[in-house]
Amino acid sequence: MKSENLVLREVPATKYQIDRAGLIGKEIALYKDGKLVVKDKLIMVSAPEHSPGVIGLYFDEMPTATIDRSGVFTIKYMARTRTAS
């Protein structure tokens, strides 16, 4: 029997930089100083050619809040994990 569990993960990120693994189509919430500034569904992750180590996040809607891009953010997202039993 398979079941899906939602696991809350916290990933430190700067200027929307984040590891690309397993985030496409997931809803993520971006927090700064304890305030939710944007929560949306991630539709694409890209690594610019001029900066291979930098990951860009693209959402299905633009964030409506003003974000201090010089700060360090924590991105919290619900990742689905499957367990077989």
Indicate residue ranges for each PLM-predicted region:
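Mixed-charge, Lys/Arg-rich low-complexity intrinsically disordered regions
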Residues: 2-21
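Short beta-strand-centered aromatic/proline hotspots
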Residues: 38-46
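Short acidic, Gly/Pro-enriched loop/turn segments at secondary-structure junctions
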Residues: 51-52, 78-85
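Short coil-to-beta-strand transition motifs
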Residues: 31-39
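Structured surface patches comprising rigid loops and adjacent beta-strands/short helices at the edges
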Residues: 67-81
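Basic/aromatic-rich interaction segments and small domains that mediate binding to polyanionic partners
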Residues: 45-65
